[in-house]
A protein has these predicted regions:
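C-terminal-of-GTPase-core extension/linker across diverse P-loop GTPases
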Residues: 2-11, 141-263, 280-282, 294, ...
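Glycine-rich, N-terminal phosphate-binding loop of Rossmann-like dinucleotide-binding domains
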Residues: 21-22, 87-89, 239, 274, ...
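A glycine-rich (often HGG/GG-containing) alpha/beta subdomain
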Residues: 1-145, 149, 153, 329-330
Length: 457
């Protein structure tokens, strides 16, 4: 990492764009193309965290006016000397400034190379580097706060504490076995078991944070289901804020699964408006109904829409039991009309799907109650986005491997096997946790993380 890299660090088309340099010659390269209005402000002599206004030139050719900010190693994003040109945001202007700094001695940065350098220079951990991806992809307040929590080191600290406990247990076992003549405290199986159980509880919680984390980051896969003409499409259009589904009084109008991603409060829903669940002789509608059933099987959340202004139909009585044991909210629609569902019918529905709300999709009422009901059934009512949360498949794989090895160690200890055998399992668990943090991650694993980055990050 002795060379100096450069890249456009902002999306094109904005009013302001940035060209970023990082490396040992970043300030010198910047000085070759920058003409400050105040001649005393040379990039190489400016204090860190300061800026200067001037012109960017390629030889004698003026390219743009810009503000140059400088940061001195190790107090920068990458841990290296960094220079940032804030120019006008036109694509051609930025490309010309980038070409000028490359001609002056920098080389084009690779995808994710700035953050990779931050990792290699100890400015961030691997989990913190992964959080940068999540910040860029955040779709709502919760996902942004979760990503920022990871960037602040919430997951890294909790995983490292668990790994340290396991390493300490291994060291104690090794010292007691290998140096019996020394004054080493005897390993107490009950005390050791208590420590291991606490670590296992931590890993179990982290492993189960995966599903919540996915719902927060990627959105809740949601199927809107119900019989024909109960208001599913009206609800879809209300949630999406535009007409995505055809709304008529004719049953079977929606013949396929219509998908949309919407924000509902601080939640993101990946909605699927399904064809009405009913018997039909229309072969096209039959295909739509079959796709609806598949969407029902694969979703995280079911919004089951019923028409409160009429009694249950035989078809509804047939599919409602499928909600049992699922994360489902029963939506009694058309509350603006006289109710026709009986107390007995609502009681039978509550027996299979206890959470329900009454709304009028046509009038747009009841959304606040629906939002809270969704949080309740998917387990996000008390979700803390700043807590340690598993963010991706790599992290989940490490946690699962660690928990599996730890469970084997606990079972070996309880079964009275040798402490050597227990220690081997604990070492494997600790190794998996340290792989998660990046301390023992292979170059290939790190490469896969940075494959997800774009140039300039």
């Amino acid at each position: 990492m002795r060379d100096t890299i450069a890249a456009i660090a902002t999306a094109t088309g904005g009013g302001v764009g940035m060209v970023r340099l990082s490396g040992p010659q970043a300030l010198a390269v910047a000085g070759r193309v920058f003409r400050p209005m105040n001649p005393t402000k040379s990039p190489e002599t400016m204090p860190g965290y300061t800026g200067a206004f001037g012109r960017v030139c390629h030889g004698e050719q003026l390219l743009d006016e810009a503000v140059l900010f400088v940061y001195h190693a190790p107090h920068s994003y990458t841990g290296e000397d960094v220079a940032e040109f804030c120019c006008h945001g036109g694509e051609f202007v930025l490309s010309q400034v980038l070409a000028a700094v490359i001609a002056a001695g920098a080389r084009p940065a690779e995808a994710g190379e700035y953050t990779r350098r931050a990792l290699m220079n100890g400015r961030m951990t691997l989990t913190e580097a992964e959080s940068v991806i999540d910040i860029l992809a955040a779709q709502n307040t919760q996902s942004l706060r979760a990503a920022l929590g990871a960037m602040e080191g919430a997951l890294h600290r909790e995983v490292l504490a668990a790994a340290d406990t396991l390493t300490d247990c291994c060291a104690h076992i090794s010292a007691w076995i290998d140096y019996p003549e020394e004054d080493v405290e005897e390993v107490s199986p009950p005390v050791l078991l208590a420590r291991l159980n606490r670590v296992e509880a931590t890993l179990f919680r982290l492993e189960h944070s995966w599903q919540q984390g996915q719902m927060v980051r990627q959105g809740i896969a949601t199927a809107i289901i119900g019989s024909a003409n109960v208001g599913k499409s009206t609800l879809m259009n209300l949630l999406s804020g535009r007409e995505r589904s055809i709304v008529t009084d004719i049953p079977g109008t929606t013949r396929d699964v219509i998908e949309e991603t919407v924000r509902l409060g601080d939640l993101t829903l990946r909605l699927s408006d399904t064809a009405g669940l009913r018997q039909s002789d229309d072969p096209i509608e039959q295909i739509g109904v079959e796709r609806s059933r598949r969407a029902l099987e694969q979703c995280d959340l079911i919004l089951a829409v019923l028409d409160e202004s009429r009694p249950l139909t035989p078809e509804e009585r047939e599919w409602l039991p499928q909600l049992s044991g699922r994360a489902a909210v029963v939506i009694y629609n058309k509350q603006d009309l006289p109710p026709a569902l009986t107390a007995e019918e609502k009681s039978a529905i509550a027996a299979v799907a206890p959470v329900s709300v009454s709304i009028s999709a046509a009038a747009g009422t009841g959304l606040a109650e629906l939002t809270e009901a969704i949080r309740q059934v998917v387990g996000l009512s008390h979700f803390d986005p700043t807590a340690a949360i598993i963010a991706n498949a790599r992290q989940l794989e490490c946690i699962t491997a660690a928990r599996r090895s730890l469970r084997e160690g606990i079972e070996a200890l309880v079964a009275g096997e040798t402490l050597d055998a227990v220690s081997v399992c604990l070492e494997q668990a600790a190794d998996a946790l340290l792989t998660l943090t990046g301390r023992r991650a292979s170059a290939e694993a790190i490469d896969k993380v940075f494959e997800q980055f774009c140039v300039g990050k």
